[in-house]
Regions:
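Formylglycine-dependent sulfatase
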Residues: 2-5, 14, 19-427, 431-433, ...
Length: 483
């Protein structure tokens, strides 16, 4: 790109951001922070155990979304969807191995859009999918067209895997409940190195517009972080979540298959409490890295010219419903995830929104805030109006899918979340139905799908769900072993 074209684009972005916020400003930088497998185990989201002062600080600065939902609670498809603005059914990506460009070779990703507008587009760590921990330090399943600079740190954690406690030795540490309270400093761990490199890139590019993707690997298993973060969570303060004794009695087997069909993997409660302690320690470790990024922005005087978006690829189970762990489910804990926007000058800053939003909405939102025109084909909806007025009525709906092994054969789950209801079908109901009333059952303990009193609700939600997402096993290629 010639310097003249670059100057014209930058001037155009200046005008666009001025028009949007009603005050002079230079083009916004974007600090796009991703965490891996982080559920709403954050103090500002109401978690009574979590110690997360820096994410709380970011929430106080910006707009926290309490009801943000991923498109698939699995690393590769959710990240591909979020970064392209296209739903999994459009990308034909449902597993951990298929690249979105196999189906959409000409897709323009969110960071690629910034490149087209003359920004530096940079990545440190995990934005697209990586196998964790074995692909740490590589490009993973990256998209080279998205970036003009990438950094792949590889820390001490990758050299000490032999020290990790694995509660399920028959499974790899990437999938098992496994952890290490590590010796050494934050900066020696991969995520600490990611933070250091991100700060370096912000400093080097402080005088030109940048899009910087910062992708942390934690709290994905194995839960590895410096020992000092374990000290924040005495084991006697860790509790397993409440569930009625008969919680699973009215739920289809497909709702649990592949994710703890046997509660807590059959492990002793003392062990799963240690796993939960390790997860929280990793959350606080990631929180500390976010704090380093915020401090760096302030010290560089970039806070007033940088949008910050913090998100996790999906939610995560920590023993809910009598012992579900990890992801790939369509309950609230797996489908919902943290989302915090800080935009300089946004009128909604310092508040929270209860409106239903989807991760596919991030692409058009970030583009609009920066004065960029996204591709016409993207399927999300800009939530800029909520950032300006978080208490507005949005009437959003979220659609989440999960393709995975179930009772020996692949099964597709599809779920719609409205402000009141969650309705879920497994293979369009052939493998079970679920309906939960969030007005009085936020824990999703009572399945109303087969209650005749709710037949009309089921019919209405079924029509909406089937009109938007695939509810059966797809004909497109997928790897059954990598669901």
């Amino acid at each position: 790109m010639t310097s003249l074209k670059h100057s014209n684009l930058v001037f155009g972005l200046f005008l666009a951001t001025t028009a949007l916020f009603g005050q002079p400003s230079k083009p916004l930088n974007v600090l796009f922070i991703a965490s891996d497998d982080l559920t709403q185990s954050i103090a500002c989201y109401g978690d009574p155990v979590a110690i997360t002062p820096n994410l709380d600080r970011l929430s106080d600065m910006g707009v926290r979304f309490d009801n943000a939902y991923c498109q698939i609670p699995l690393c590769n498809p959710t990240r591909a969807s979020l970064l392209t603005g296209l739903r999994p059914d459009t990308l034909k990506v449902y597993d951990l191995t298929r690249h979105f460009r196999d189906e959409k070779p000409d897709a323009i990703t969110l960071p690629q859009l910034f490149l087209k507008y003359g920004y530096r587009s940079m990545r440190v760590g995990k934005l697209y999918h990586y196998g964790v921990p074995h692909q740490i330090g590589t490009n993973g399943l990256d998209d080279p067209q998205s970036w003009d600079e990438v950094v792949n740190p590889k820390g001490r954690d990758t050299e000490e895997e032999h020290l990790i406690t694995n509660l399920e030795p028959h499974r790899p540490i990437s999938a098992a409940l496994s952890w290490l309270a590590a010796e050494g400093t934050d900066e020696e761990q991969t995520d600490g190195m990611i933070t250091t490199e991100a700060i370096r890139l912000m400093n080097e590019n402080r005088n030109r517009p940048f899009f910087l993707g910062v992708g942390f690997f934690r709290p994905h298993t194995p839960y590895v972080a410096p020992k000092k973060y374990w000290d924040l969570y005495p084991i006697e303060k860790i509790r397993m979540p409440y569930a009625p004794e008969d919680d699973r009695a009215d739920m289809p087997k497909s709702a649990f298959a592949h994710n703890c069909p046997i509660p807590n993997y059959g492990l002793a409660q003392s062990d799963v409490l240690k796993a939960k302690q390790a997860y929280y320690a990793n959350v606080s470790f990631v929180d500390a890295q976010v704090g380093r990024l915020l401090d760096a922005l302030e010290s560089m005087n970039l806070m007033d010219s940088t949008m910050i978006v913090f998100w996790s690829d999906h939610g995560y189970h920590l023993g809910e419903h009598q012992g579900i762990w990890q992801k790939r489910c369509l309950f609230e804990e797996s489908a919902s995830a943290p989302l915090i926007f800080y935009t300089p000058g946004a009128r909604g800053n310092g508040t929270a929104s209860q409106e239903i939003v989807e991760f596919v909405d991030l692409y058009p939102t970030v583009a609009e805030l920066c004065g960029l025109t996204p591709p016409q084909e993207i399927e999300g909806k800009s939530i800029v109006p909520i950032l300006e007025n978080p208490r507005m009525s949005w009437r959003g709906e979220a659609f989440t899918q999960a393709l995975r092994p179930g009772n020996g054969l692949p099964v597709m789950g599809a779920s719609i979340r409205t402000d009141r209801w969650r309705y879920t079908e497994w293979n369009e109901g052939q493998q079970g139905l679920e309906l939960y009333d969030h007005a009085q059952d936020q824990g999703e303990f009572t399945n109303l799908a087969n209650d005749p009193a709710y037949e009309l609700i089921v019919r209405k939600l079924r029509a909406k769900l089937r009109a938007r997402v695939l509810g059966t096993v797809p004909d497109s290629p997928f790897n059954p072993a990598r669901l």
